């Protein structure tokens, strides 16, 4: 199983949005992320990097 840590970045600040992510769905700028326990978050932005070897996904979050 490939699980990832999702990092969100707004301007210069980067934070962990979710650990142990098992699913990512993208619809335009809406990104839905679900972890292995079924918890789901939704963020607006764009995926900027996916590193499957190191289980990292980086998202530039939209300014709201």
Language model segments and positions:
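N-terminal acidic leader/helix
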Residues: 1-25
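Short loop/turn microsegments at loop-to-beta-strand junctions
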Residues: 28-29
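Short, acidic, Ser/Thr-enriched surface-loop or helix-capping motifs
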Residues: 35
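C-terminal structural segments of small proteins and small subunits
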Residues: 10, 39-64
